[in-house]
């Protein structure tokens, strides 16, 4: 989106990602001009594991994933009232997000999008990343694929021209 000339403000609790605003969104209250778009991607690890069979050792976790970050993102969206908004996550989040966010609006590769945004086409050519274990694997996998953000930004720009 930055490549297309958008002003982008990033918010994250992890300073390693070098966000513009480093904070916990569960206590964050935005003040500033109303953005055209808010994109939230709560961590998907619990939801990714939730979609695996219970017998898998890596799936030994609480029965219910924590949806507090999604709820915080939705609270911010409701408070700020941008024209467009997206909350993105994985297939394992669907049953937890639908009661609050409504039906999935778009699926692109392994990513599921809820929100209010113009529908767009996007080649999910990025697929599931097969990355070896590493210290920054989770950070790399959490990045929004360039094709996806570009397709959405073009759709928003096109709808603004109408």
Language model region names:
Residues 1-30, 36-39:
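SAM cofactor-binding core of SAM-dependent methyltransferases
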Residues 12, 26-37, 44-162:
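Class I S-adenosyl-L-methionine
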């Amino acid at each position: 989106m930055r490549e297309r000339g958008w002003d982008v403000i990033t918010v994250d609790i992890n300073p390693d990602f070098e966000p513009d605003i480093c904070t916990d969104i569960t206590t964050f209250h935005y003040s500033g001009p109303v953005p055209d778009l808010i994109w939230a991607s709560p961590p998907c690890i619990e939801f990714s594991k939730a979609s695996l069979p219970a017998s898998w050792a890596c799936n030994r976790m609480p029965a219910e994933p924590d949806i507090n970050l999604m709820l915080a993102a939705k609270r911010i969206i409701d408070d700020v009232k941008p024209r467009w908004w997206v909350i993105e996550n994985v297939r394992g989040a669907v049953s937890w997000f639908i009661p609050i966010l409504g039906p999935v609006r778009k699926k692109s590769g392994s990513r599921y999008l809820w929100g209010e945004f113009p529908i767009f086409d996007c080649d999910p050519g990025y697929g599931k990343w097969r990355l070896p274990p590493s210290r920054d694997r989770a950070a790399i996998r959490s990045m929004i694929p360039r094709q996806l953000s570009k397709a959405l930004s073009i759709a928003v720009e096109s709808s603004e021209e109408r």
